[in-house]
A protein has these predicted regions:
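Catalytic cysteine-centered active-site loop
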Residues: 19, 23-77, 126-127
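...with weaker cross-activation on analogous glycine-rich loops/strands in unrelated enzymes
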Residues: 11, 51-114, 135
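Short hydrophobic/aromatic patches on the structural cores and recognition surfaces of FHA
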Residues: 40, 96, 131
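A generic alpha-helix preference that emphasizes hydrophobic side chains
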Residues: 14, 37-38, 93, 128
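Intrinsically disordered, low-complexity
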Residues: 1-24, 73, 123-135
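A short, polar/proline- and glycine-enriched secondary-structure boundary/capping micro-motif
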Residues: 115-119
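Alpha-helix initiation/capping motif
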Residues: 6, 30-34, 120
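Residue-level detector of conserved, well-ordered beta-strand and adjacent loop positions
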Residues: 18, 28, 54, 82-84, ...
Length: 135
């Protein structure tokens, strides 16, 4: 799969996230050398902005301090994205950062590293829960 980085320097959160591509997935890790999914979003936000977000994917996804985006089509570069990988009632157990062009960056337990994945037309489209706009 080929990814385009033409947008990469347009958003500071994406710039930070891209620096960590290929770093290993480790459950409960919050960086900078390894991450789990919410540790990755937590670390990137904390590094770039003057605020922190909740630590777990569930708490990040349900934090009503930030605008909720219910449609993939409404996502903007830098939005956090949340997925229901377990397909259970909480609807929010995986987190990543939308980087544009139908792609998001995340610490993937399946891929065992920080990676970029597409949303539409993939497994992730079917389990997309919502996004949150931080700024």
């Amino acid at each position: 799969m080929c990814f385009s980085f033409t947008y990469a320097f347009a958003h500071p959160l994406v710039d930070e996230a891209i620096l960590h591509l290929e770093k290993p997935y480790v459950y409960s890790a919050t960086g900078p050398d390894s991450f789990d999914c919410s540790g990755f979003t937590y670390y990137c936000v904390d590094t770039v902005y003057d605020f922190t977000i909740e630590r777990t994917a569930y708490k990040q996804g349900y934090d009503e301090s930030y605008y909720k985006i219910n449609s993939i089509a409404q996502l903007q570069v830098g939005d956090l994205v949340f997925f229901d990988t377990k397909r259970d009632k909480d609807k929010c157990d995986h987190a990543g950062i939308y980087i544009g062009n139908n792609q998001f960056i995340h610490a993937s337990s399946a891929g065992e590293k920080v990676t970029i994945s597409e949303i539409r037309g993939t497994f992730y489209e079917g389990i997309f829960s919502w996004g949150r706009r931080l700024i």
